[in-house]
Amino acid sequence: WIMGHMVNAIEQVDKFLNLGANAIEFDIDFDKDGIAQITHHGIPCDCGRKCTKKAIFTEYLDNIRQVTTPDDPKFREQLVLLALDLKLQRISSAKAYRAGEDVAKKLPDHYWQRGNSRARAYILLNIPLVEDYEFIRAFKDTLKNEGYESYNDKVGINFTGNEDLDKIRDVLEILGIHKQVWQADGITSCFARGTERLKEALEKRDTPGYNYINKVYAWTLVRKSIMRRSLRLGVDGVMSNNPDRVIKVLKEKEFADKFRLATYNDNPWEKFRG
């Protein structure tokens, strides 16, 4: 999976897909009451990027629904995964549950259209910190209460704050989540990051019977040398400002026979058995 990073304006979607991304990440900004308002990262952000691109969240969902719906004029077959980077750290932790309720209503309204949409992308909920886990509880509670619990099959969980992996496991255990879990490891492209935690996540992913990490990705990679390093370690995905660079690295002799781009037929919730 090649995740285009910080794709917050509607016009950026095609740009990142044209560069080779088969997944996109966009930021969800909430008001003080936990209501999802816009797709927006804000300052600071990655080096060399404009931090202020934005769209109204519901309008963004309406557009991305078309892009991921077969036979729609806007359909792009390669886009199979949407990563929602939930900016919960900007609101009170007490509002995390309300935020989860809100997103769990807006997705059925604007993406799945209450069962009337054929939009098919998988969705990854990126939670910044384990202290915001009530968002997940609210999201699942609300889908159930709204009668759309079946959509949980299309939704995965990911904690992005580089926290202790055992602490994350404990929270997932509290929530009763034992599947459909990704684990991110990374830092803004402005800085270098070691591989200790990334290696630990990959080791846990590959441990038989360990159900708290199904996929691992590294972010935000812009240098080809770091992309190569991550691929050698065996990541499932790379988040990048430059998907075209990832494509070029994947075509190199060292990686061409070991990796390929994920398609809709690849289940993002299953561990890869090479």
Swiss-Prot record:
GO molecular function, one term: metal ion binding
Documented EC number(s): 4.6.1.-
Residues the record marks as active site: 5, 41 (nucleophile)
SUPFAM superfamilies in the record: PLC-like phosphodiesterases
A Gene Ontology term for the protein's cellular component: extracellular region
Protein's cellular compartments: Secreted
Protein's UniProt name: Dermonecrotic toxin SdSicTox-betaIIB1bix
Species annotation: Sicarius cf. damarensis (strain GJB-2008) (Six-eyed sand spider)
